[in-house]
Amino acid sequence: MSLQQKIKAYLKLGKLGVVSLLDLAAVAGAFLAYKHGISLLPIIPMFIGGTLASMGAMIINSGIEIDRDKVMSRTSKRPTVVGYVNRKEAIIVGSLLAILGTALGFIDNILTAFFIALGVVIYIFVYTILLKPRTWLNIVIGGFAGSAAAWAGYTSLTNSLTLEGFLLGFLIFMWTPGHFWSLALKYREDYVNAHYPMLPAVVGITTSARAIAISNTLMIPIVLLLGYYINLIALIAFSILSLFLMFLSYRLILNPTKEEAIKSFIFSNIYLMLILLIMIIVKLI
């Protein structure tokens, strides 16, 4: 296998699509903390470090889950499953990236490095190893891994975590269950076959649809409170986006199908992305 093919395999295992959303959360966190006269340069080591650490965590996850990935159609073609990267390689390379990413966080401050490392620890040890194979609460508690990215971004400029910074991380924590349960509902049989107790594999489609709607509903007050802290423009924009999210959640309850679930999954991605982009834009205006 050529070096170029190996690099492509690791990039695929690094899940750049997922990592890019974490990066956006980190940058949004930094801009949320930004005040006139503060240098934006600390964003650079935080961004690079967070990206490397997040990719490292994803690669380690793929190394750990090879056996279960083999029986899931969604993951059966991962480089770790088809043999391009073995378990030992994935864990070693992923660990090196996570360590390097955390080290870059120290260029800003200890708190930023701590949150970068915390995201890795929660994703690997709490979510992947401890909770995912054992309880449907896996993605609920594991959502704090995403929160850590936002907190790393916020602290990169402030070296402290205030209420507004905490709210951004808590928003991501609240967003995570409904988002991933929507995906798990579509691939419910995969999780059943792999013996993962993801909520849709445990309680069925109808109850899962209700849980997704409830999860999304509980998130919205956090979104609106964060919008209130930012400014009126953000509050109005967040309100409009939240209304559409609730509309899709209501449709999923009325028609709990895989097709509606994937629509909810796709829009929840767009929803969070737009919330984060709006936060950045209003700070630049």
Curated annotation (Swiss-Prot):
It is an enzyme of class 2 (transferase). One of its GO terms (cellular component) is plasma membrane. It holds the Pfam family UbiA. Its EC number is 2.5.1.141. It is found in: Cell membrane. It is a multi-pass membrane protein. One of its GO terms (biological process) is heme O biosynthetic process. Its main location: membrane. The chain crosses the membrane at residues 13-33, 40-60, 89-109, 110-130, 137-157, 165-185, 194-214, 218-238, 265-285. Keywords: Cell membrane, Heme biosynthesis, Membrane, Transferase, Transmembrane, Transmembrane helix. CDD domains: PT_UbiA_Cox10. Signal peptide: none annotated. The keyword Transmembrane helix applies. It catalyses: heme b + (2E,6E)-farnesyl diphosphate + H2O = Fe(II)-heme o + diphosphate. Belongs to the UbiA prenyltransferase family. Protoheme IX farnesyltransferase subfamily. PANTHER family: PROTOHEME IX FARNESYLTRANSFERASE, MITOCHONDRIAL. NCBIfam families: cyoE_ctaB (TIGR01473). Carbon 2 of the heme B porphyrin ring is defined according to the Fischer nomenclature. This is Protoheme IX farnesyltransferase. It comes from Saccharolobus islandicus (strain Y.G.57.14 / Yellowstone #1).
